[in-house]
Amino acid sequence: MDLQAAGAQAQGAAEPSRGPPLPSARGAPPSPEAGFATADHSSQERETEKAMDRLARGTQSIPNDSPARGEGTHSEEEGFAMDEEDSDGELNTWELSEGTNCPPKEQPGDLFNEDWDSELKADQGNPYDADDIQESISQELKPWVCCAPQGDMIYDPSWHHPPPLIPYYSKMVFETGQFDDAED
């Protein structure tokens, strides 16, 4: 019988204990994994800075020889298992070697500077005149104008409503003598 159950019986409690006893109730010392706040973060910061430097130089992978945060590699902590064939030191096809350099980045001065005035002067031979531009602007403000049918139109509600899920078949009722003159 554990401590909680014995205490419940001694006090005459009608409610039995639920679940396993807490570690603090057993008097056991907390596990080392429980104390996250006491860890030294300076080694983590150095590893992070090294990794950022490698990435800035163009290296896409971090070598496996530097353990991250004490035991094991960073990839093992994240839940990725390293294959034994991949950890033989050879570069995979997607990894870059240390000597490979990235192409040089463009400097801000190399970027194209737009000069709108010169572009407007160059477009003087534009086939679209101000009337075309004004008409397109009016269609943007009223989008139904371009979709509206031209000419005499009869209202058709099927354009504005989805078709029914159950087809409706009207039963035609003929009056006697309605089509007598059609036979002649």
Swiss-Prot record:
Residue ranges of the region described as Disordered: 1-136
Superkingdom field: Eukaryota
One annotated Gene Ontology cellular component of this protein: nucleoplasm
InterPro entries: COPR5 (IPR029289)
Phosphoserine PTM positions: 66, 75
Sequence ranges of Basic and acidic residues compositional bias: 42-56
Compositionally skewed regions (Low complexity) per UniProt: 1-14
Signal sequence coordinates: none
Keyword set includes Ligase: no
Acidic residues composition-biased segments: 78-89
Subcellular location: Nucleus
A Gene Ontology molecular function term of the record: histone binding
Alphabetic keyword roster: Acetylation, Chromatin regulator, Myogenesis, Nucleus, Phosphoprotein, Transcription, Transcription regulation
Gene Ontology biological process terms, A to Z: chromatin remodeling; muscle organ development
Residues bearing PTM N-acetylmethionine: 1
UniProt function note: Histone-binding protein required for histone H4 methyltransferase activity of PRMT5. Specifically required for histone H4 'Arg-3' methylation mediated by PRMT5, but not histone H3 'Arg-8' methylation, suggesting that it modulates the substrate specificity of PRMT5. Specifically interacts with the N-terminus of histone H4 but not with histone H3, suggesting that it acts by promoting the association between histone H4 and PRMT5. Involved in CCNE1 promoter repression.
Oligomer and partners: Interacts with PRMT5. Interacts with histone H4; specifically interacts with the N-terminus of histone H4 but not with histone H3. Interacts with CBFB. Found in a complex with PRMT5, RUNX1 and CBFB.
Protein name: Coordinator of PRMT5 and differentiation stimulator
Organism: Homo sapiens
